Amino acid sequence: MSMLFYTLITAFLIGIQAELHSESNVPAGHTIPQAHWTKLQHSLDTALRRARSAPAAAIAARVAGQTRNITVDPRLFKKRRLRSPRVLFSTQPPPEAADTQDLDFEVGGAAPFNRTHRSKRSSSHPIFHRGEFSVCDSVSVWVGDKTTATDIKGKEVMVLGEVNINNSVFKQYFFETKCRDPNPVDSGCRGIDSKHWNSYCTTTHTFVKALTMDGKQAAWRFIRIDTACVCVLSRKAVRRA
C-alpha cells in the first residue's frame, strides 16, 4: 500500500512539473485554465480512494496466487539430500497428527513427491503404558500456512506456500512439534525433584530443506521449524547455614 501511495505522489508531482513547464511556454496574457488543476487533483483523489479501499486480504491473495505459476521439476524430489520427513508436498491436507505414522496416502491418484518412511521408523517406537507420563507435554501438527521463516543464516525468507508440479498445484506442509505448556505442573517439568532442581519445558528447533523464494525463482533453503519439546534443568542454589 505504501509503495502504491508513493508512486501516486510521484505521478502527481510529475504532473505538476509538466503543468508548470507548459505554463512557462504559454504566451503572455494567457493563463492555464483552472479546470486543468481541478482535473489533476480529482484524478489523484480518485486513485488514492481506490488504493485505500482495496482490501488487504485481496492484495495478499493476488500475491499468494502468483506462487501457483512457479513450476518445479519433479525430479528434484528424487534427490535424497532434499528429502525430509517433516516436509511434505501434497494436493490435499495430510492426516491429523494422530495419524501421521502413515504417510503412504494417495494424493490426486499419486503419492506425494517426497513421501518418506516415517511409518517404518515409528512402528518400533514404544507405546506409553498406563501410568507412564512424559516430563513435558507436546503437540504436533501439520502447518500449511507458513509464509516466512528464518534460514540457517539467520535471515528471514519467504516460504513458498504452493508450487506447480506436473500441472498440479501442490501445497508445502511442515510437521511441527512444540510445547503445549511450559509448566505442565506447578513446579515445572513433570517428575522432577523441585526441591533440588528448577525446570521448565521449552520448544527446540531444527533446520529442514524447504522451497523458498529467491528473487523471482524457487530455491531450496534450510529453514528453522519447531521439532521437539524438552525439559530444561538448572540446579537450585544450596543454602548454607
From Swiss-Prot:
Binding-site list for a 1-acyl-sn-glycero-3-phospho-(1D-myo-inositol): 173, 209
- Please indicate which superkingdom the organism of origin belongs to: Eukaryota
Where in the chain are disulfide-linked cysteines found? Answer: 136-201, 179-229, 189-231
A single GO BP term for this record reads:
cell surface receptor protein tyrosine kinase signaling pathway
- What coarse category fits the chief subcellular location reported for this protein? secreted
Question: Does the UniProt entry include the keyword Hydrolase?
Answer: no
Which residues make up the pro-peptide? 19-121
Cellular location(s): Secreted; Endosome lumen
Extract one GO cellular component term from the record: axon
| Keywords assigned | Cleavage on pair of basic residues, Disulfide bond, Endosome, Glycoprotein, Growth factor, Lipid-binding, Metalloenzyme inhibitor, Metalloprotease inhibitor, Protease inhibitor, Secreted, Signal
Which residues bear sugar attachments?
A: 69, 114, 166
**Per UniProt, what is one GO molecular function of this protein?**
growth factor activity
* Residues engaged in binding a 1-acyl-sn-glycero-3-phospho-L-serine: 209
Q: Which residues form the signal peptide?
A: 1-18
Question: Quaternary structure?
Answer: Homodimer. The homodimer interacts with a single NTRK1 chain. The homodimer interacts with a single NGFR chain. The NGF dimer interacts with a single SORCS2 chain (via extracellular domain). The NGF precursor (proNGF) binds to a receptor complex formed by SORT1 and NGFR, which leads to NGF endocytosis. Both mature NGF and the immature NGF precursor (proNGF) interact with SORCS2 and with the heterodimer formed by SORCS2 and NGFR (via extracellular domains). The NGF precursor (proNGF) has much higher affinity for SORCS2 than mature NGF.
* Family to which the UniProt record says this protein belongs: Belongs to the NGF-beta family.
Function statement: Nerve growth factor is important for the development and maintenance of the sympathetic and sensory nervous systems. Extracellular ligand for the NTRK1 and NGFR receptors, activates cellular signaling cascades to regulate neuronal proliferation, differentiation and survival. The immature NGF precursor (proNGF) functions as a ligand for the heterodimeric receptor formed by SORCS2 and NGFR, and activates cellular signaling cascades that lead to inactivation of RAC1 and/or RAC2, reorganization of the actin cytoskeleton and neuronal growth cone collapse.
Protein's UniProt name = Beta-nerve growth factor
Q: Which gene encodes it?
A: NGF
